[in-house]
Amino acid sequence: MTNIRKTHPLAKIINNSFIDLPAPSNISAWWNFGSLLGICLILQILTGLFLAMHYTSDTTTAFSSVTHICRDVNYGWIIRYMHANGASMFFICLFLHVGRGLYYGSYMFPETWNIGIILLFAVMATAFMGYVLPWGQMSFWGATVITNLLSAIPYIGTSLVEWIWGGFSVDKATLTRFFAFHFILPFIISALAAVHLLFLHETGSNNPSGIPSDSDKIPFHPYYTIKDILGALLLILALMMLVLFSPDLLGDPDNYTPANPLNTPPHIKPEWYFLFAYAILRSIPNKLGGVLALVLSILVLAIIPLLHTSKQRGMMFRPLSQCLFWLLVADLLTLTWIGGQPVEHPFITIGQLASILYFAILLIFMPAISIIENNLLKW
């Protein structure tokens, strides 16, 4: 009798995705982040569900309902902080996952890569709306500033912003709809992640060498299941260290002050994982230009496959490209730092230089260096 896991319609899908899946024998720990992102998503949905049971999406009670969760609900404080810091872990895994894709040429699977970019936008939108829900000072002013950016769109901008707000300012209608969207988006993300996996399994995983590995495959279980479990344990360890020892390390103290439309905080800034994009936005003195640069800072990833000029897939054997990649990482860290600084000298200039360098590396230097490397190897 054939094993039920290979014949049952539902079990067969799980089997072909997580058990009998042929995987390259040499994929490193950088390939762990896909499964870690899945764990983050499940964790966020579960903690979010329990928070939604006690949260009220009304401007008068939202802040006090979050306080109530932390003070009065059984283990509410740990659920709340796991959800808030879980978002940070989610983005750490996301950035490492995208970085891995850039380094090893995983963008050569165009469908998987493009769905990944859509996923990145969806997760960013979800995180932004989630940050608005506690209705603290930074929630309110963050929502006001970021939604206001849409008014830069010619002709329809102002109407679009008022339509999103549900009024003439960020108010009750805005909070209610943000809660609704924040609740539904993770399920859309789950569906997109399934499609992301579907396309990945059409081609099979890439590997560090960038060489096709069809001749040397091993089953996913037990080799990579055990490896993923180790990664998951380390992720949960890091998350719980953050939650239990310094839960407010990555948050903003301003968000412990209830939202006040009459009092603007001195420095409006988003959560740390948006600071790089925020720095790029602020580096352009024109409103529409800034918004375009903000969108392009992520959308630029979509044209990376078209700019691949190297004869090799990954950067494993390309030291010049490796130097450029790590320069890009340093540049993103610089942008993250600048995004959290006030708009004054010398931060403005540093931000502008770092923004130019970010686009220059991706659009000019990387393709150019790849051509030079091809010539050095006489290919």
UniProtKB/Swiss-Prot annotation:
Give the residues the record marks as binding heme b b562.
H83, H182
Which is one Gene Ontology cellular component term of this protein? respiratory chain complex III
Source organism, top-level taxon: Eukaryota
Any one GO BP annotation for this protein = mitochondrial electron transport, ubiquinol to cytochrome c
Q: Give the molecular function GO annotations.
A: metal ion binding; ubiquinol-cytochrome-c reductase activity
Query: Which key words are in the record?
Result: Electron transport, Heme, Iron, Membrane, Metal-binding, Mitochondrion, Mitochondrion inner membrane, Respiratory chain, Transmembrane, Transmembrane helix, Transport, Ubiquinone
In which compartments does the protein localize?
Answer: Mitochondrion inner membrane
Q: Which cofactor does it need?
A: heme b
Q: Membrane topology type, per the record? A: Multi-pass membrane protein
| Quaternary assembly | The cytochrome bc1 complex contains 11 subunits: 3 respiratory subunits (MT-CYB, CYC1 and UQCRFS1), 2 core proteins (UQCRC1 and UQCRC2) and 6 low-molecular weight proteins (UQCRH/QCR6, UQCRB/QCR7, UQCRQ/QCR8, UQCR10/QCR9, UQCR11/QCR10 and a cleavage product of UQCRFS1). This cytochrome bc1 complex then forms a dimer.
Additional observations: Heme 1 (or BL or b562) is low-potential and absorbs at about 562 nm, and heme 2 (or BH or b566) is high-potential and absorbs at about 566 nm.
Q: What is this protein called?
A: Cytochrome b
The gene for this chain is MT-CYB
